[in-house]
Amino acid sequence: MILGYPGRTNRWMPANGIEQNVKYAYPAWVEGAKTGMDNMKKFMTKDATVNLQYASKYASTANYWKNRQGMIDALTKAKTAQTKTKEEAKFNAWANKAENKAKYGDVIATINNYYAQTNLKARHDNYLTQLLRTATYGTLPASLGNGLIAYAKENEAKRAEMLPRLTSAIDGAYGSLYAPLEKEVLTAQLNLYAAKAAEYGLAPKVAEMKAANNGDFTNDVHKAVTSSIFTSKDAVLAFLKEPKVETITNDPLYVISNDLMTKIRAKSPEQTKADDDFAIAFRKLVEGLRESKLNTIQYPDANSTLRLTYGKVRALPADKRNDAKINNYTTMTGMVNKYKAGDAEFDLPARLLELNKAKDFG
């Protein structure tokens, strides 16, 4: 029996929502995350300090990268979207009966139209989100830069009040930043974003740069980091002594970062209306499925609140490398049998292997 906070679930998601995730959103997430991880890893494997600095970011990215690929595989194998499609066809027939049509008649059409309208946006937003998650130069110049602009516009008294918070933010931002790594990650992510998300429409400045560089941002990023104040903590601190708004607004990394952040936050009136229409239709779908008894799910999705779960703990699939009597825990023998030199998950220290061979367990 487990008491805990399970995060969120989407068991009521419609068929086309699942299709959108499997074909548009999650593949973009997986590729974007892998691009960030690969370029982080190039530097992490060469320097123990960098490895420590980026371990948390890498692990967090890898966690969701595995999750999204696992979701693609599982949903495809289980044919979940096809099952939902059949269920929704039955619901649509029920919804268009005379006694139900006024309330439920347009629910499926509204939902399907929404996903058709947002498939490309889902792909675009996931590529851009992974850029922003893995590339500090994608977010920091805009977030910190806007604070510096506000600082520059104030009088001396107000600046003195703002200074401690800004200094603290700068210390936090640059405490574990490794500039060569960040340059590589931003370059790779801009190349990927410009290549894969263009069908929906890129951030305007990025689209302008792509037209001039044929999709290779290597030189653009090199020029930007060479002349930007945001690649150096000392340069940002120096700005605080002589603050000028134009120093930030003309900074090349700020221009790119602000362009990306503006794009991910943008929402047109048409998109707002589509979101509102979908929200209403989805609530009606859930209500109608429960009323019609066409769905076996009779409980709400998890919403990050405390839940109780109970049942049996099943063992993992049998593995001849694991000598555990029940395959739900790991032994030293199992670890050694799974040992792979140089592998990120299954490498082991040479000293541990020696101690195990000598049966020296302390």
Language-model regions, residue ranges each:
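Terminal presequence/propeptide segments associated with secretion/organelle targeting
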Residues: 1-362
